[in-house]
Regions:
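Active-site microenvironment for binding and transforming phosphate-containing groups
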Residues: 1-252
Length: 252
């Protein structure tokens, strides 16, 4: 059920992260089998069984977001326990508050301070990246770090996303990113089709993280489009969603 290439050895001892793939669930084709999304047309009973199976491995049920490819960041310290916030990122300092991001080609990014006092989760498609969802999430985390009067760094973990040899975009997408930072032009390789480019979403995210002073980044080797163990919207159109989750462990 969990098939992402990252080294979890650098995760703070008081933080847990978890990535799902498409295996080991109850959903039938074309959502087979561990689909966690309720908005893609899958049988809701199957989705609930999948969510229940996932929750059994967690300290609490996750905070599912209504993701809209924007840059809003939800402060999960204020979660009421039942609402579905409309946002594309979340942060928290609360133990056992499970942050979750759903994806099927977009890049999920999990973030933690080096001592695990503040965590974040980001849904980073190209629209969210371009509108500053990474920067806004880091700023939200830093505001919580400052209130604790301690110097901390932030590290990032990439879940599975579409790879640079599979993610074709148009000139308009390239222009948006290059106008923001001309150095990222190297992350757009001309495609065989005129006016199209193969984009490196991992590289674009690294660029934004580096600009925010974050250089401890793990993951980025997986391709959802090429690896059939992952859901891929671009490959299959009608398909499920995977989850990337992070939480602070409660003190014993």
């Amino acid at each position: 059920m969990f098939d992402v290439s990252i080294d979890t050895g650098s995760v703070p001892s008081n933080v847990d992260i978890l990535f799902t793939d498409r295996k080991g669930g109850f959903s039938l084709p074309p959502y087979e089998s561990f689909n966690l999304a309720t908005h893609v047309g899958d049988d809701l009973n199957a989705v609930q069984k999948n969510r229940d199976q996932l929750t059994s491995k967690l300290p609490n049920r996750p905070i599912w977001l209504n993701q809209v490819h924007g840059h809003e960041v939800f402060d999960a310290d204020d979660w009421d326990g039942c609402s579905i916030p409309t946002a594309d990122a979340a942060v928290t300092t609360r133990a056992n508050q499970v942050l979750a991001i759903m994806t099927a080609d977009c890049l999920p990014i999990l973030l933690t301070s080096n001592c695990g006092s503040v965590i974040g989760a980001v849904h980073a498609g190209w629209r969210g990246l371009a509108s500053g969802v990474i920067e806004k999430t880091i700023q939200a985390m830093q505001s919580k770090i400052i209130t604790k009067h301690t110097k901390q760094t932030i590290r990032a973990y990439f879940g599975a996303a579409i790879g640079p040899k599979s993610f074709e975009v148009g000139e308009e997408v390239r222009t948006i990113f290059v106008e923001h930072d001309p150095q990222v032009s190297k992350l757009f390789i001309p495609s065989q089709r005129a006016g199209k480019y193969m984009a490196d979403i991992y590289g674009l995210a690294r660029n934004r993280l580096n600009a925010m002073g974050i250089h401890e980044i793990d993951g980025g080797q997986d391709c959802t489009y090429k690896n059939m163990n992952f859901f891929s919207y671009r490959r299959d159109q009608v398909t499920g969603r995977m989850a990337s989750l992070i939480w602070i462990k409660a003190s014993i």
